[in-house]
Amino acid sequence: MRLSTSALVLGAASSAVAFDQKVLGDLKKPAIDLDLSSWLNFGEEITAEAKAVWEEVSMLAPDAVEAFKKQVIGTKPKKANRRPDNHWDHVVKGADVQSIWVDKNNEKHRKVGGRLDNYNLRAKKVDPSKLGVDKVKQYSGYLDDEEQDKHLFYWFFESRNDPENDPVVLWLNGGPGCSSLTGLFLELGPASINKKIEIVNNPWSWNNNASVIFLDQPVNVGYSYSGGSVSNTVAAGKDIYALLTLFFHQFPEYAKQDFHIAGESYAGHYIPVFANEILSHEDRNINLKSVLIGNGLTDGYTQYEYYRPMACGEGGYPSVLSESECQSMDNALPRCQSLIKGCYESGSAWSCVPASIYCNNAMMGPYQRTGRNVYDIRGNCEDSSNLCYSGLGYIAEYLNRQDVQDALGAEVSSYDSCNMDINRNFLFAGDWMQPYHQVVPNLLEKIPVLIYAGDADFICNWLGNQAWTNKLEWPGHKDFKNADIKNLKVEGKEYGKIKTSGNFTFMQIYGAGHMVPMDQPEASSDFFNRWLGGEWF
């Protein structure tokens, strides 16, 4: 996840769009309706606090607000050159899969539910010897939404161990707008890229005992592209369901395995909705067994309360702010939470956008202005041009090589680790502060949920993640809140704490920032394998 204090205020109007957003409760309806005329009467739809924030932005950037009123500014489409179907080893037509019927309880049913006729899946076998990322079987390709001109890129790695029986995991990075190939090469995939742009094997890769799909989503992220854009989590969920359905149809040898979704950061938004979308289809070929969210943003109302404690010495690391700065964050919290509450209650972008603008500036701004790494409170940014990490630059250089793009079938003209247009689109669609934690109880009725957090992260810190899991209202709330906290160990060495009850588990991982598998590879491999093995559920 990347946040820019100045961009949030001064870029507000120039990047914004006028939205009428549906209330979250109905996840089957499109979340967004464009309505430019709504600017004229939006003051009747939002709280006085939210309106005041809009007025503050108007004073800071009047020209930008005028531009906001007049036009919708969307994501610039990526330049792409679609490869012909004969380039691919497999082309799966969603309409064909949608038309398959089977007998069930003496009645005819579609084999898999959901609308698929606008989707197609393309796949090619990747020659491991060409790239040297791993020796295992690999596929890459695109999910195409032909109706919406959306094309999502994925890269699949088979398990190094027992692919016929090991589970399958979908990995999602956050942002919103950051490529999941970051997770592949910087965190948990079979290899990393060094400063010489060379492949380096990762002995702690998550595909040691699981097959892993790395997906660039939403569109216009990484190798994915579109003539349009996606600016809300619910819409993106339909694409994920289609991708998995068509992938498992083409490769049924993986469909019989257990399936899990894992991710970090803004995936705290994505994963509850994506899992809920999958579970909503009774007839499906996706054997979803659990979800894992690392250092996620899921419940803004609760989590934003813990930026001040984390920055001011209450999260296990020394304070990085002065007393007066800490006090100013305390003073700002009531207004921040009031704005978020208004967003939760209305679901309207007119309420949710001011909440994001005000809270990000008031609760994150003081920390950001120190120059410290928002993803790791232990130090400063090593590379401000690459979200604090030089490794992102190495990855981008590698993935922009023509031989790499040809080997994978990539169709875009360039690769970027993060697309900040997407980040702004989600923000100004009101998606940022939506209460996606309210979807989690529905998941807990059906599957286990793991929330893990590196304890040195600031931006989605462990204090906030611990707090929202303790506060979440679900039938097992009391038992979970009162559950014993136990040590996590590998090879006799303690690396964290765990609390688990029923289908809900929370982990605090020591000495790790926002990207736990990067900072603590052995520890993350340990809890990942134990989780997939069902130790805590």
UniProtKB/Swiss-Prot annotation:
GO terms for cellular component: fungal-type vacuole. This is Carboxypeptidase Y homolog A. The active site is at 265, 457, 514. Belongs to the peptidase S10 family. It catalyses: Release of a C-terminal amino acid with broad specificity. It comes from Fusarium vanettenii (strain ATCC MYA-4622 / CBS 123669 / FGSC 9596 / NRRL 45880 / 77-13-4). GO terms for biological process: proteolysis. Residues 1-17 form the signal peptide. GO terms for molecular function: serine-type carboxypeptidase activity. Vacuolar carboxypeptidase involved in degradation of small peptides. Digests preferentially peptides containing an aliphatic or hydrophobic residue in P1' position, as well as methionine, leucine or phenylalanine in P1 position of ester substrate. Residues 18-124 form a propeptide. Pfam families: Carbpep_Y_N, Peptidase_S10. Gene3D superfamilies: 1.10.287.410, alpha/beta hydrolase. It comes from the Eukaryota. Its EC number is 3.4.16.5. It is found in: Vacuole. Keywords: Carboxypeptidase, Disulfide bond, Glycoprotein, Hydrolase, Protease, Signal, Vacuole, Zymogen. Its main location: other.
